[in-house]
Amino acid sequence: MRFLAIYLFCVLLSSNVSALDCRKDIFENINFTICKTYLFEDDLRLYLKNSNGVPFGNFNTLKKELNDKGKELLFAMNAGMYHSDLSPVGHYIEKLSKKKNVIARPGPGNFGMLPNGIFCIGSDMMNIYETLEYLQNTPKCTYATQSGPMLVWNSKLHPRFLEDSQSKFIRNGVGTSADKQFAYFVKAENRLNLHTFARIFKDKLKVPNALYFDGKVSKLYSKELDQHDFGWPIGPIVAVVRSRN
């Protein structure tokens, strides 16, 4: 146990280590990209604004600022719904600093389709909490972003999803493992409804909880896959970074 603790401590100190695994896969004729991250080996963070207080808006501006700071972008994805000024719609924490409060009430659109949830990155766990559970448990999150709806909650699909829904878009989201050590970021590369998208997490990845990030504007960056999606400006960004050698 002592050796394991020392090993994990050393891993955390080393920002050059990454277990990030990105790949292409298929679920029921739907092509999707998945990036799997590991809490103790991947430097996973949330980003919103640059050092001048301006929203990054895209992966290129984030890459440039990271490069100027001696860091490299390995993976990135839009991470939660946002307003026209690119500010988060819901709860947002960056480097332990709360930028936006939790929104627990129902509302319009996918965000307000309760239950919605919060993706939390802490020092010893990565987890998706249903919003009311989050308020009850008050976990200590270094980073957090609220979005909605929950795709999968306690291994069950959101009750309002319809299998035959014709509302089909490119979509993206995140799921977390039962041991709270792994996060799975998924972007569908074909249009699909929320029911099918949620089943990628439930039936293919077998995760107990998954959260919808967005549709229409879904984007992913992967150095490993040489994938860099462009398009409309985005708000919060989740990313894996490492220090340059």
Residue ranges and their predicted role:
Residues 19-33, 37, 42, 126, ...:
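Flexible, D/E/H-enriched segments
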Residues 38-41, 120-125, 153-155, 176-181, ...:
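Short acidic-glycine loop/turn motifs at beta-strand connectors
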Residues 49-54, 133-137, 187-191:
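Short, solvent-exposed aromatic-acidic interface loops
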Residues 87-161:
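Active-site-adjacent helix-turn-beta-strand microarchitecture at beta-sheet edges
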Residues 89-105, 160-172, 176-178, 182-209, ...:
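Conserved, well-ordered active-site substructure
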